[in-house]
Amino acid sequence: ALGLRAFTLFRQKRMALFFIFSMCLGICLQITNGFASPFIFSFGGIPEYADTFGVQHANILISISQISETFCILLIPFFLGRFGIKRVMLIAMLAWVFRFGFFALGNPGSGVWLFVLSMLVYGVAFDFFNVSGSLFVDKETDISIRSSAQGLFMMMTNGLGATIGTLSAQAVINRFVYALPETASGQEVIAGWNTCWYIFAAYALVVAALFAIFFKYKHVVKDECGR
């Protein structure tokens, strides 16, 4: 009644690996949800960037991520049919590498285009794993526990993964982000964010590599295209 039968899926190696990697991607999701805004706003203490559009309208800049997310859903049927579920999920993992990497390299001034690319690639990073992952669960589980399995998938990504992501990302940020001496105008300058984003990008790259090596799945065109 409580959906606990879904936990028996951990007895299957492929499903266990899938749920573990789902948790790992949930960590990435929480990193970007929790710290993208503070990162962009931190440029406000630097005179060169204080009056830029990115700093003054950071929420509008970040909203490009949601727009991208909406349009990337339309790409999923094509990519699933062309590349299969495993490769689509791997593309999502690599997209997280670019999401974090563009943050590390960009700035709200001359490098704002890198921020825009980071927002655009978010749609691939989010949709390609969450939607294809849900389809994978639906296909691989018995109808009697399918709903519970979907709940377990959400728990691993938005529950356990999000919790670990919040705690671990905060630990990294507390370690590497620091305040520089105040400027002549009395503004506080925050530094060290780039290091954090490189660490997060490296983490996503390691997860993608491990997924490519250990997660086994054979693409069958007629099953995944619905033909």
Language-model features: locations:
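C-terminal ends and interior cores of transmembrane alpha-helices
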Residues: 95-108
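Intracellular juxtamembrane helix-capping segments at the cytosolic ends
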Residues: 128-142
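Juxtamembrane intracellular "pre-TM" segments in multi-pass secondary transporters
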Residues: 1-19, 45-46
